[in-house]
Amino acid sequence: IVNEQSLMQPDTDFVKIRLEAQRFLEDSCKNNNIGFSVCYFGDVYGNASWFTEMIVNRLKNGTFKIPGKGDYDKCFIHVDDAVGILLSIAKNNLKDQSYVCADSTSVTFKEFVDYTADKIGKKHPGGIPMFLAKGVLGSDLVKLLTTPMKISNQKVSEIYKFVYPSYKEGINSILES
């Protein structure tokens, strides 16, 4: 379970570049006596986002496929909660902190997608072999999407009360809007 004390082990180019940018910003802030805090967000979803475009719309037209079996744990956070956390950090002037930010529910990618399909009355999608997914999306993106991750949001929960404590409430709010 990943928390704020976990060792960083970037295994994709995307994460490596993101951590380099973080180090640059952190160093620049320290050199200029500016407080710095960082949020490590799970997969942020919301209306008119990758969730709507890549999952909902493709489930509706029957073209969505899950990379592999979808049995990898993922961490999700609704965009409203992501913004709420950032506002809480700013309003409370919390400096030199790190926060792991995702909702409180552990879920596999397949469970997340199947729940969405059920809510819109569509069939559960099948999987696509990993080698095909890598051919279409690239191996770095597939690795990023399919790396299992479980987190503890205990620290961030001390400064913020989630509007959507699980992906189910978050998905419902999007689909009902």
Which positions does each model-derived feature cover?
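C-terminal amphipathic/interface module of NAD(P)-dependent oxidoreductases
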Residues: K123, V142-S177
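Mid/C-terminal beta-alpha module of Rossmann-like enzyme folds, strongest
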Residues: I85, I89-D140, N172-L175
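Alpha-helical membrane-targeting segments
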Residues: M54-C75, D118-M149
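NAD(P)-dependent short-chain dehydrogenase/reductase
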Residues: S28-K74, V79
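Glycine/proline-rich active-site loop of Rossmann-fold NAD(P)-dependent oxidoreductases
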Residues: L19, N32-I34, V44-I55, I89-Y99, ...
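N-terminal Rossmann-like NAD(P)+-binding domain of SDR-like oxidoreductases, especially those catalyzing
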Residues: I1-Q9
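Active-site Tyr-X1-5-Lys
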Residues: Q9-S37
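Residue-level signal for the nucleotide or nucleotide-sugar donor/cofactor binding architecture
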Residues: G46, K74-D80, V107, I151, ...
